[in-house]
Amino acid sequence: MQPCVLWWLALGLLLGIPAGAKPTPEEADPNAQPPAMPYWPFSTSDFWNYVQYFQSQGAYPQIEDMARTFFAHFPLGSTLGFHVPYQED
């Protein structure tokens, strides 16, 4: 019994100690395009009316998706993960 326990302990230590291998970082795809900016064809008041409607329904994930689409058209869209083209004032 004793040699069996020692054998499994030694095997566990050998397999449990990392060999120093590091995962290779994934390279960025050179052909990958940033996500396209979503289109919001409605007015600002329409947006807030939709927000109130979804709040009354308790549909908070839909509000978040709609807000990302709406606010992507403003200069802060780049902070939401969308590529916002340069606009002159």
UniProtKB/Swiss-Prot annotation:
A single GO cellular-component term on record: extracellular region
Main subcellular localisation: secreted
GO terms under biological process: sensory perception of sound
Signal peptide positions on this chain: 1-21
UniProt cross-references to InterPro entries, sorted A to Z: Otospiralin
Keyword set, alphabetical order: Secreted, Signal
Tissue expression pattern: Ear specific. Expressed in the cochlea and vestibule, but not in the cochlear nerve, cochlear nucleus, spinal chord, muscle, cerebral cortex, cerebellum, diencephalon and olfactory bulb. In the cochlea, expressed in fibrocytes of the spiral limbus, spiral ligament and suprastrial zone. In the vestibule, expressed in cells located to the stroma below the macular and crista sensory epithelia and in the subepithelial layer of the walls of semicircular canals and maculae.
Entry's localization field: Secreted
TM segment ranges: none
Keyword Ribosomal protein: no
The keyword Amino-acid biosynthesis is annotated on this UniProt entry: no
Domain of life, per lineage: Eukaryota
Family: Belongs to the otospiralin family.
UniProt function note: May be essential for the survival of the neurosensory epithelium of the inner ear.
The name this protein goes by in its record: Otospiralin
Organism: Rattus norvegicus (Rat)
Gene: Otos
